[in-house]
Regions:
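Glycine-rich, proline-tolerant flexible connector loops at the mouths of alpha/beta enzymes
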Residues: 200-216, 488-490, 558-568
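Alpha-helix-loop-beta-strand connector modules within alpha/beta enzyme cores
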Residues: 212-238, 288-295, 519
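Active-site-adjacent beta->alpha loops and helix N-cap segments on the catalytic face
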Residues: 207-220, 268-278
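Glycine-rich beta-to-alpha transition loops that act as phosphate-gripper elements at the mouths
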Residues: 234-246, 483
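Catalytic cores of alpha/beta
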Residues: 242-256
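Short hydrophobic alpha-helical runs that function as membrane-insertion/retention elements
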Residues: 198-200, 259-264, 479-482
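Flexible, glycine-rich loop/tail regions that form catalytic "lids" or insertion modules at the edges
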Residues: 1-177, 186-190, 194-197, 248-249, ...
């Protein structure tokens, strides 16, 4: 090759001629050679991997049926994973991060033309040297692999493409640290044997073998390959029964996996089709489920301004909440973790507990019924909810009856909450000698710094939205209009007894129009990265009303000169 410029893989493919097949595109096809499980085996595996009834019915079934994620209410009032007594999966300890101000997010729906979900599996090659060997990779349009896709990859026999399987299971009661060290030794072995595609699989869980948490295994192997300078020559494919929700797949890709095959989720869909819970073709249902997962990952990546799955892989755009440095430093290196938390011992205990619920240590018959954990909706024996029927009843009755004593009882119950939030674990330190009263700031001075959160008119109701503005204006605080703006009529109430004009006017990122400000605000708030996006089709039909007014709307500009000057 005479040219010294860097070239695209498809250009190199043409130059390679008949010597190399170039990029191998994996298309979906149907085969009967995929390993299948009986209903009892599926039920036992679901129990061993901690599936819940909500995940079975509301998550997997919904995505397989509709091809999109299920719609749930905003807000989380359940405990953090580290404070929960329901043994949450390791995925739950990682929180997604999103762009704020410095790196504006993108709208993956309206800007679909710039998104790319394809991934290339194989040796990356030398980007500084043009050679046909750089094209010895597999092109996969969706990193969520069907069982048949993975079967094809396992059977690939092409120059430079040598897949090798490594088990991520270990003997029951074995230390996870020892299991991971053995895993590293096995990875080195297949590397020396010439493997260029590493397939981590947890098929083989039984009475005596437990699965290493898939996220721990993937991240540990990824960082081991990085430390030993092998990450560019041996990408990771995960074959696991554990992932089933969008967040699970996002963390796996973010911590180094190139593709994931959720075989138990697919087997669960097969079972639903056979039992009549899904009235559609099995292959269509699996395809829709995989597409729903992919769409969710694209949405998550877009919050960071990332438009391609390849850029998202290995990016580690997560913050760990409730994991100790003993786990973070060696296995999730460079992950942000501001507080300590669980160690390898607690992770082992959770794995052992879930396994014992599926395979009784004494050989007795086990109850394989999925537990209704109640993470999305309250259950009497389920996950703790800060706002439960008891507290909501007190709040409603205190307001309806105008009973301040009952309201104090409500706030007392909220203050007594001992689980769920980090702040509930902290208390004030009071000096023994007290504080001179002249050094104490007055209540009137303190409340002037109070601000409400940015809650748009469409997210709550007219009464609640206006009540917040009136209340904050009376105590000289500041309410935030939210990205939906507010009616121009409310601007006319400024200075009156019931001033309904929000002190802070929020301007969203080119999503919603807003009324001219006309100096009627004390502060501006710019929002990026969250809120309802116009192309996502998420607003419930019942929230559409005649109050939506597009008249007198103006375009949003980032230039200061386009806005009227604020009142002095």
């Amino acid at each position: 090759m005479k040219s010294k410029r860097l070239m695209r893989p498809d250009s190199l493919r043409g130059m390679a001629g008949s010597t190399y097949d170039g990029i191998k595109k994996i298309s979906r096809s149907r085969t009967k050679k995929v390993e299948q499980y009986t209903k009892e085996e599926c039920a036992r595996l679901r129990k061993a991997f901690g599936y819940s009834y909500e995940e079975y019915h509301d998550s997997i079934r919904t995505m397989a049926l509709n091809g999109t994620e299920g719609i749930t209410s905003m807000g989380v009032d359940t405990p953090l994973a580290a404070l929960s007594n329901k043994q949450p999966l390791l995925f739950s300890y990682f929180k997604q991060r999103f762009a704020q101000v410095t790196n504006p997010p993108i709208d993956a729906v309206r800007e679909k033309i710039v998104t790319n979900t394809s991934v290339y599996i194989g040796k990356e090659g030398n980007i500084l040297k043009e050679q046909p060997e750089n094209c010895q990779v597999l092109k996969v349009n969706n990193p969520i692999l069907s069982d048949t896709d993975l079967l094809k990859i396992k059977g690939v026999r092409q120059p430079g493409l040598y897949p090798a399987e490594v088990m991520i299971t270990c003997m029951k009661h074995m230390s996870l640290k020892i299991a991971l060290e053995r895993l590293f030794i096995e990875v080195d072995r297949v590397y020396k044997d010439g493997a260029s595609i590493l397939i981590l699989t947890d098929r083989g869980v039984d009475e005596t073998h437990v699965a290493i948490p898939s996220l721990l295994a993937v991240s540990a192997v990824h960082h081991y390959l990085v430390r030993t300078k092998k990450s560019t020559v041996m990408p990771i494919i995960l074959e696991s029964a554990e992932p089933r929700e969008v967040h699970h797949f996002a963390t796996l890709l973010g911590y180094g996996a190139s593709a994931v095959n959720p075989y138990l989720a697919h087997e669960t869909i097969r079972e639903m089709v056979e039992d009549g819970l899904l009235e559609k073709d099995y292959y269509a249902a699996v395809h829709d489920y995989d597409e729903a997962i992919l769409g969710g990952i694209v949405k998550i990546a877009s919050k960071m301004g990332i438009s391609t799955i390849q850029s998202y892989q290995g990016s580690q755009i997560f913050e760990a909440v409730g994991i100790s440095k003993e786990v973070i430093d060696p296995y999730f290196t460079h992950t942000l973790s501001r507080v300590g938390g669980i160690t390898m011992k607690e992770i082992e205990e959770d794995v052992e507990l879930r396994h014992s619920q599926a395979f009784d240590p004494l050989g007795r018959k086990t109850d394989l019924t999925l537990e209704s954990v109640g993470r999305h909706s309250f259950r009497s024996q389920g996950e703790h909810h800060r706002y439960n029927p008891a507290t909501i009843h007190l709040l409603q009755q205190s307001v309806w009856q105008d009973d301040y004593t009952m309201f104090q009882e409500y706030t007392g119950q909220i203050d007594k909450e001992e689980t769920g939030y980090l702040r509930s674990l902290m208390d004030f330190r009071y000096p023994k000698e007290g504080v001179p009263i002249e050094e104490v700031e007055s209540v009137d001075s303190i409340v002037r710094r109070f601000k409400t959160g940015a809650m748009s008119y469409g997210s709550i109701s007219q009464e609640a939205h206006e009540a917040l503005a009136v209340a904050m204006n009376k105590i000289h605080g500041k309410s935030n209009s939210g990205e939906g703006g507010e009616s121009p009529e409310r601007l006319l109430t400024k200075g009156t007894k019931d001033d309904r004009c929000s002190a802070i006017k929020q301007v969203a990122s080119d999503v919603w129009c807003h009324q001219p400000l006309s100096g009627k605000r004390r502060r501006d708030s710019n929002q990026d990265g969250s809120g309802g996006k116009a192309g996502r089709r998420r607003p419930p039909a019942g929230k559409e009303s005649v109050s939506v007014d597009c008249k007198n709307s103006v375009f949003y500009s980032r230039r200061e000169s386009d806005f009227p000057a604020a009142a002095p």
